[in-house]
């Protein structure tokens, strides 16, 4: 993995649902992926992972060692339900506790990057106070992450507060901390009125990973590859020419499909073909 190969991963929700990480990582290996990104979303089932016992955490670490497939990142979308910008003090406190537990979990199992959802609030009306609370919550979160040596990385979202790399960079400059970086989603970035290539270039030096999916304006999930507006070849070329050498993660939600593995294999081949056209020959 320290060669010039492009690290290519798959999102947990693309693979069959379940809690056996050995089976999940074995399937990812069979499908040719280097890593799997874990999801801790707003459902009680996935949130409960943050309360795993020592034995459960060790089982994940052992599965990683046995398969050679890493789990280097976590997509922490639980803050939709418990936002850091909430005006309800109890909800906000829960959001901060989820952050603390996620950072501790990451430290325990070797996760290096926690991808954050860029919502001040999601189910409520946003205002200046929710944005202030969100900024303060991020500051407190980054302090915790610094002590644990875990990187918090902001996703470029399906939401106006954080729908461009330029906006996320504003938070990076505000926090001014090496443990806060960016994790752009080229699908979300392309669905808004952004100069996508300029945005990607602006983020170089702060981008720690890239989500790969297709989108349409106003449609941010479950758009089949090749049917949306994303110019994948150009995005890959821009990132390569700008010096980005980090991981790419195919983001899909096919865990409930009739044959998730077949859906993932089809997407993998499609993405790798675009990578090869962009001159990322190691991915071909």
UniProtKB/Swiss-Prot annotation:
Keywords: Isomerase. Pfam families: AP_endonuc_2. Pathway: Cofactor degradation; L-ascorbate degradation; D-xylulose 5-phosphate from L-ascorbate: step 3/4. It catalyses: L-ribulose 5-phosphate = L-xylulose 5-phosphate. GO terms for biological process: L-ascorbic acid catabolic process. InterPro entries: L-Ru-5P_3-Epase, L-Ru-5P_3-Epase_Enterobacteria, Sugar_Epim/Isomerase, Xyl_isomerase-like_sf, Xyl_isomerase-like_TIM-brl. The keyword Isomerase applies. Induction: Induced by L-ascorbate. Repressed by UlaR. One of its GO terms (molecular function) is intramolecular oxidoreductase activity, interconverting aldoses and ketoses. Coiled coil: none annotated. Transmembrane segments: none annotated. Catalyzes the isomerization of L-xylulose-5-phosphate to L-ribulose-5-phosphate. Is involved in the anaerobic L-ascorbate utilization. Belongs to the L-ribulose-5-phosphate 3-epimerase family. This is L-ribulose-5-phosphate 3-epimerase UlaE. It comes from Escherichia coli O127:H6 (strain E2348/69 / EPEC).
């Amino acid at each position: 993995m320290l060669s010039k190969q492009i690290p290519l991963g798959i999102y947990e929700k693309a693979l069959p649902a379940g809690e056996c990480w050995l089976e999940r990582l074995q399937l990812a290996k069979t499908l040719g992926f280097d890593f799997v990104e874990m999801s801790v979303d707003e459902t009680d089932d996935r949130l409960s992972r943050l309360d795993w016992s020592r034995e459960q955490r060790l089982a994940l670490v052992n599965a990683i060692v046995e398969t050679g497939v890493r789990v280097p990142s976590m997509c922490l979308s639980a803050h939709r339900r418990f936002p850091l910008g909430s005006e309800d003090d109890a909800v906000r406190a829960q959001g901060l506790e989820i952050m603390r537990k996620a950072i501790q979990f990451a430290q325990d199992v070797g996760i290096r990057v926690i991808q954050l959802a860029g919502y001040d609030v999601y189910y409520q009306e946003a205002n200046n106070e929710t944005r202030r609370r969100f900024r303060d919550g991020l500051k407190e979160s980054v302090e915790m992450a610094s002590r644990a040596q875990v990187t918090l990385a902001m996703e470029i979202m399906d939401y106006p507060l954080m729908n461009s790399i330029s906006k996320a960079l504003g938070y990076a400059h505000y926090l001014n901390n090496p443990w806060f970086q960016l994790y752009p989603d080229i699908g979300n970035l392309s669905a808004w009125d952004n100069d996508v290539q300029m945005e990607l270039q602006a983020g170089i030096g702060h981008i720690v990973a890239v989500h790969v999916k297709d989108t349409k304006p106003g449609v941010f999930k479950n758009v089949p590859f090749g049917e949306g507006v994303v110019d994948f070849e150009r995005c890959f070329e821009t990132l390569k020419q700008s010096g980005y050498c980090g991981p790419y993660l195919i983001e899909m939600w096919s865990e409930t499909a009739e044959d998730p593995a077949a859906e993932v294999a089809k997407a993998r081949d499609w993405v790798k073909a675009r990578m090869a056209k962009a001159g990322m020959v190691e991915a071909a």
